[in-house]
Amino acid sequence: MTHHPDELEIWFLTGSQHLYGPEVIDQVAEHAARIVAALDASPHLPVRVVSKPVLTETDSIRRALLDATATDSCVGVIAWMHTFSPAKMWITGLDALRKPLLHLHTQANQALPWAEIDMDFMNLNQAAHGDREFASVQTRMGVARKTVTGHVEDPEVARRIGLWARAALGRHALAGMRLARFGDNMRNVAVTEGDKVEAERRFGVSVNTWGVNDLVAVVDEVADADVDKLCEEYADSYDVAAELLPSGERHESLRYGARIELGLRSFLTEGGFTAFTSNFEDLGGLRQLPGLAVQRLMADGYGFGGEGDWKTSVLLRTLKVVADGLPGGTSFMEDYTYHLVPGEERILGAHMLEVCPSIAEGRPSLEIHPLSIGGREDPVRLVFDAAPGPAVLLGLADLGERFRFVGNEVEVVAPTEPLPNLPVARAVWRPAPDLRTSTEAWLMAGGPHHTVLSTALGAEHLDDLAEMTGTELVLVDADTTIRGLAKELRWSAAYHRLAQGL
């Protein structure tokens, strides 16, 4: 499934004014084009950057930002004040902007030509205070934005702009997302519930429910020839258990798993859905709880949440888009159990079946095992250990009055010992700053037990996404203390309640 359509772009807006004359404006445009070309050539940018005409007056600024807001292909705006652009000209435009904004504080030249500097040079290259003017009005208006300082030849500048651009792509995907719930939430579970109307108002995602037997009807219509072809793909991609091979006694179970995948994929494609949920308590006429099918759809970029958890499904799809093209993987995850030996503390995460193979180390095995819940036939699933490396965990909580992201920086590690009797995919990680602080902080913040684990993303991606969506982010990292977090949560609650009342 395509994550970053070719037509998507970021608009680069350069501010100036008519005071300096047309020759200076032409130079400003030339310098802006060079900066855009450098950004466009950077491997850090996942989407093209498009230079727009230099903006010099209130009406053209307002029109440019209205156009950015109304243009579906524009996922965000980068703004730079090359010369001095009086910021009162930007007020109505900034007030109309509804796309993510990055304020690039840069200049055309990296080194000053000391012996050649005259007042013409000073008038042209005055972003040092032109951007301060621009930032002051943004702060007064409460404009959400990211600020990046430095010359575009500095790889760190392009890297940080690239992080923001990825978050903007995620926000764009979120704003147009359609999610299909097959059945309802797991009975009596609190954390998988949430306000779907507020989610659509806040994020733009449309969450609706279909009967499981609507899916079953599509599954039952899948052609045998298509099942044959998909089973061949399984054999090429995974280490298939002997009993599931064509000569094995349980090959029919694999064929039914393939039938579920083909039917589910068809249903989602036809409906324009990029995320979905299932619930083992509501399987209708399905003979298996979807396992392999869900894992492979996640690997292709779909969002998923178990037990009807649409919030985590939304989050997974969003972060899949943010991470597209980066090394590592991104998966649905659940904290399951702890290793509490002093000095060796770590968390074992898994789920009944549905962990994405994008985080796998090596070639997954395709197996069949009993499942004690759901009351259906034994489901097929991929089994693997997650690849070691730095990662982030992120959950989305509905606090009633607002949504909150809760995140944790972690280190995925190899299992301390082999897990020969655990018939599901799994990940083991050490949370920052330590298990005790991490878990106490997570519980204090009301973080959910379903999360997204990503070895492709870092904390700055999460910061940028939270800023763009106007969502609180509680991030547990190496610097977190329980005392400090308790204060942060109190201050944050006061801030958000006050902000909603204004």
UniProtKB/Swiss-Prot annotation:
Transmembrane segments: none annotated. It is an enzyme of class 5 (isomerase). Gene3D superfamilies: 3.40.50.10940. Its cofactor is Mn(2+). Pathway: Carbohydrate degradation; L-arabinose degradation via L-ribulose; D-xylulose 5-phosphate from L-arabinose (bacterial route): step 1/3. InterPro entries: Ara_Isoase_C (IPR024664), AraA_central (IPR055390), AraA_N (IPR055389), AraA_N_sf (IPR038583), Fuc/Ara_isomerase_C (IPR004216), Fucose_isomerase_N/cen_sf (IPR009015), Lara_isomerase (IPR003762). It comes from the Bacteria. It holds the Pfam family Arabinose_Iso_C. Keywords: Arabinose catabolism, Carbohydrate metabolism, Isomerase, Manganese, Metal-binding. Mn(2+) binds at E307, E334, H351, H450. GO terms for cellular component: cytosol. Its EC number is 5.3.1.4. HAMAP family: Arabinose_Isome (MF_00519). Belongs to the arabinose isomerase family. This is L-arabinose isomerase. It comes from Nocardioides sp. (strain ATCC BAA-499 / JS614).
